[in-house]
Amino acid sequence: MRLKKLVLDVLFVGVVVLGLLVISQRAKAMYSERLNHNSLSQKAVIFKTKSHQSIQSTIQAIDQTKLNNFQVQFNVNNHLSYVYAKGKQANVPLKDGRFFSNYDFKSRIPVVVVGQSRVNELYQPTSQAYYQTKNRYLSVIGVVGTNQTTSLDQHVFISASPEFVLNNRSLNQVTVLVDDQQIGAHLKEYQKIFKTKSISNLTPKNTPIIGVNWLRENGTAAIILVLLIIVARGA
């Protein structure tokens, strides 16, 4: 009996350790996924619109509402986004400088935040670095990134405001993403502004609890551990 109890205790500890590993892996997977989605949360929604309304007109329409604590990204491509936000925003991992403030989203002068892999492309005659777009140089206020290698490293974010949008495009030329923790309550209002009912989740709802690579490396051990517990309890 003592041996059986000892075996069960050891196996129980193994299950606890395995559970902690699963939780840790899930947290790492979620964080990595967030970084690959321009640091937007799992609640972020993609609005697919064919509207010819300009980005600036759209921001002006949003500014007239009571919406707060949100971030909107107008993605030109996989490496460039115009950003407008109001109120509290999710934390972005910074290597240097700062992320956009509410003041930047009211200013007529756009500023830039770049991923750490884009730093070498910047023009830096003094301590201030600049991002060149066509014939214009924009002040860089921050560098984002972590020790992980993610798509965030390659991204360029340019602030936008009701007063000015650089290279103002129409909505059908960009991908519109909204990160709002109250998206369910505000969804219809956003749909009205973006002139569309077509939406999708940035993060698929069927995202696995743990990563595929983790299952490949540890799945067999987990199955064996469970089987041993079953055998020990039946002995």
PLM segments and residue spans:
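Structural motif
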Residues: K48-S51, G115-S117, D179
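Hydrophobic alpha-helical transmembrane segments of multi-pass inner-membrane transport and secretion
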Residues: K4-K28, I210-A235
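A cross-kingdom feature of multi-pass membrane systems that activates on extracytoplasmic/periplasmic
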Residues: V176-R216
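Short, charged/polar "capping" segments at the starts of alpha-helices
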Residues: Q53-S57, N120-L122, Q182-L187
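Mid-to-C-terminal secondary-structure elements
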Residues: Q116-F157, F164-N172, G184
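Membrane-proximal extracellular/periplasmic loop immediately following the first transmembrane helix
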Residues: L21-P93
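Short beta-strand boundary microenvironments
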Residues: Q73-Y123
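Short amphipathic alpha-helices in soluble, non-transmembrane regions
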Residues: T58-I62, P125-Y130, H186-K195
